């Protein structure tokens, strides 16, 4: 069983009209209350597999900061195990996303973990952490790995590039991580 259960939510399109987003957030809030009640009921049963599973509520509201702030306040009243900010990185600019986080995250309980869903570039992670986000998920690392991309202090490099075919240097000079200590650029290049 998983450690965290995410409550049902509706991720409204970033540019959806206000009326649609308000109805969507109301629906998400109702679903969250139902999820919490059902989890409480299930955890009262003797044969429940994982009574320690945490329930996270998901803040929604598209690009409307006032709707997101109101939703954050409402879901915080449910005293959940953690909170997520969803519905970002779906059409708005990075600056709009950061502005929404700046306005929304302060209304989520500081003592509870906060998760930014579907966002995971290195820059987005740093910006999110700076704004109070604790963890992230994204296809970015696995997609980049499949395509031979790694990040170094000098930026992103493509290990499948022909110039690394006979390069015996580590991925990052001076780095002591297992990959840099054990594998050369050439070895990773030929393992493509």
Q: What do these predicted ranges mean?
A:
Residues 26, 73, 185-186:
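Active-site-proximal helix/loop capping residues that flank conserved catalytic or ligand/cofactor
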Residues 177:
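Short cysteine-rich clusters marking metal-coordination/redox-active sites
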Residues 181:
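Cys/His-coordinated zinc-binding microdomains
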Residues 38, 42-44, 50-171:
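Glycine-rich phosphate/ribose-binding loops and adjacent secondary-structure elements
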Residues 186-192:
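Residue-level detector of conserved catalytic or cofactor/ligand-binding positions
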Residues 1-48, 162-165:
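Non-catalytic, usually N-terminal nucleic-acid engagement modules in DNA/RNA processing proteins
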Residues 174:
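Residues immediately within or flanking Cys/His clusters that coordinate Zn2+
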